[in-house]
Amino acid sequence: MSALKFVRSVWESFRTTSGVEPRLIDAMRITAAEPGKVNFELPIEKQHTNRLGILHGATLATMVDTSGSLALASRGLYSTGVSTDLNVTYLNAGGKIGDLIKGEVICDKFGKTLAYTSVKFMNSKDEIVARGSHTKFVALAWKDERNITEDLKPAVNESQASEATRTSFGGNKHVVGE
């Protein structure tokens, strides 16, 4: 199974069984996935905004949490563990109703006990809106029979790639050593 298909199946599980995701970010779409990286987008609607009419920080925090889980799914974990740490840094306004917020999340480290992810968000003007990090306890998630971790190994080892070489916003892909 491809990373994209597997990530979308895990996302569908979130949407049908969780309490938060279907209420707040149900319209989020997974646009691309490969082992260790997921791209997604969310059309901004009223429930995503604050009283100023712009994207609410809680929406972005929810997306940091959920996208971190999806980054782990891109490595083959169906049950994606539980959060131990989550951080969001807000840099620019995310947009208003009708705008599109785009995100890219990367699995920085995929261990047997803990996994680490980082995400960045871009607004409709291609400005960076926020960046986040998410740490998850995954020791029990490795036991799920639905995992396909052997099928979804990244082409580049995490320790060989830097943030700059693994991101693809704007469609540019960089290879280590270029």
Residue ranges and their predicted role:
Residues 1-178:
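Terminal targeting signals and extreme-terminal segments of soluble enzymes
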